[in-house]
Amino acid sequence: MSLFRRAEGWWLAAWLGLSTGCVGLITQAALAQVGPSPSEAAALTGLHAAAHRGDTAQIEKLAAAKADTNAKAGHGRTPVHVATFARQRDALKALAKAGADLNVLENDRYDAVTIASVADDEETLRVLLALGASSKQTTSRYDGTALIAAAHLGHDGVVRQLIQAGAPLDHVNNLHWTAVIESIVLGDGGRRHQATLKALIDAGANLNVTDRTGSTPLQLARARGYADMVKLLQAAGAK
């Protein structure tokens, strides 16, 4: 099961107040973001196919022949999206050199930075950010950010990169959650989610933004029995 499919299942289940036993059903039903299937990949043509293969010579050849570097294929994906899913970093560099837009949103409103962040693909994310891709876009049906998605999944290395790149720390999505809140309510309280929360605290994230019910991050961590997260929040002065 893809990380996007799992992630969106948790998001929707939590929003609807469902038990964890229902998450699997929601997960299957959610319209989730997944990379090209083998059959979809085999059907790619032109720059999309070259991006999927990591064929930089073909990318350069097609770009020189004025191929549209931002052309959209299935699901509204550009060659940049395809290369990101396939972890083809040299292809991303070639596409950027040819003038491709690194910040295009596909049909489900995901950009390359969010795709790499959810995949916990720190190397591809590092390349994208170095090429000038934005960490600040509002993405997904939840009006979230790459940082919120990464915090939700406990991708602490990704979170640190995004913070360094200037991602908005206190963005509130349409579930009324911030990255801090998602690291708690959609996390497992374990090592990586603790490291994620610590990175957000160290960066100066607001620890007192409440969720839709008026609960603070500290109250949410206490309610879940996440003692180590409670300690982190209390040490940082959370109320």
Task: Please give the residue ranges for each predicted region.
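Ankyrin repeat boundary/linker residues
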Residues: 40, 73, 106, 139-140, ...
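Intrinsically disordered, low-complexity regulatory segments in ankyrin-centric signaling systems
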Residues: 22-65, 74-77, 235, 239
